[in-house]
Amino acid sequence: MKIACISLGCPKNQVDLDVMVHILLSAGHETVADLAEADVILVNTCGFIESAKTEAIENILEACSYKQQNPELKVIVTGCLAERYRSQIEEEIPEVDAVVGCASNKAIDTIVARLFHGEDHLESYGAKKDFPLGGKRVIGTPAHYAYLKIAEGCNNRCHYCAIPGIRGPLRSRDMADCVAEARWLAGEGVKELIVVAQDPTAYGEDWGKPGSICELLDKLNRVPGLEWIRIMYAYPERITDEFIAAMKRNEKVVPYLDLPIQHCNDTILKNMNRRSNRAELLEVIGKLRREIPGITLRTTLIAGFPGETEEQFEDLCNFVKEVKFDRLGCFAYSAEENTVAAKMDGQIDQETKDKRAELVMQIQTGIMAQKQAEKVGQTVHVLCDGIDEESGLYLCRTTGDAPEVDGNVCVSSEEPLYPGQFYDVLVDDSDLYDLYGTVAK
């Protein structure tokens, strides 16, 4: 069978899809890029917040529309939306042939076979403790970078977050298994390894070994062939002296962290069930910048959390001005069913939430413009991702730019640059998100 895949959501979801694609290929199926050619369309969904759910539903409906020209087409929905809304998907979109929960990913080949043996409207779910950790996979990203998922689930229980209800509690992946996959990825040509989980800094806590991320970084740093190791998502309360020391002693670990602080006001943080306060956040950020000069810090903020007053929002704005994060995203609070925050008093209207998020981003725009302009005249070390055919510029990234999240260094060069190769680039211009330059002589 010809299988087409639509991948939505976070890098962790991409890894799940990579495992499913490997299973399908091993069963004798083939993948195609064109949905119109497919016998099966697999929609791997995100269901984290309202905008992600909307995007997922739009893609499911698009996949189902191909049944008009191919009535035998099968549409399978997997991922977080499938896990979260089991019966609703089949009830509201009856054109869907199978809804597969995350714990059943490894049965995807059996589900495809059952569909083509005449069964329909299949549902397959397992216990959250059975969500697969690791497994043989394809590399669904460009060949020179890949995501390594080191854990599943989360124990943080933030009051706004639906993930523990979807993905279950923290289950850390065996360290030897993580290192073995990293070695395989490096052998396949991966130069940049991006370590992901809901909270990588919690790795090993379910074994009773907090701080195990430090040992894992030591081992990953010794994998031949890897050049950059990037840690995505680091919770402030787990940025210990030991963690900072591990970043410093392992030269392949790039000076980059995404700290999802969500807010800075002590009352709001407490209501979110976050474990840091404003003073502790400032201390951690200051220590990171002192100990790792040049580190790029990204964060995510929520505006309009239930009960957020004008004064508390102003506190957030002042914090953004004071800290000057290198990268920042601010989102209007999304009330997710079956979360504590959705039942709180003081829900804020959508217009106000959107306006507050926009104001934070306006502040960050000024900060970004200044930081970008300061890089003009510098020489930066970059990894080439490929070429933009329209502009003819090569798209590269510094250690401060995560793929698909941050900006690019757009390089003009008479000589060809190659994906997966490193270059030194002289920056001669900038805009809000990207730098521009030429290969340094």
Task: Explain the meaning of each model-derived region.
Residues 197, 233, 261-263, 299-303, ...:
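Active-site proximal loops enriched in glycine and acidic residues that flank catalytic Cys/His/Asp
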Residues 75-79, 84, 89, 187-311, ...:
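Conserved SAM/AdoMet-binding glycine-rich loop
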Residues 1-203, 242, 257, 279-290, ...:
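Proteins enriched for Cys/Gly/acidic motifs involved in redox and nucleic-acid/cofactor modification
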Residues 343-441:
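Terminal RNA-binding accessory module
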Residues 10, 203-225, 272, 335-366:
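Radical SAM enzyme [4Fe-4S]-AdoMet core and its adjacent flexible, acidic
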Residues 178, 195, 231, 259, ...:
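Conserved, mostly hydrophobic/aromatic
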Residues 97, 191, 227, 326, ...:
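Short acidic/polar active-site loop segments enriched in Thr and Asp
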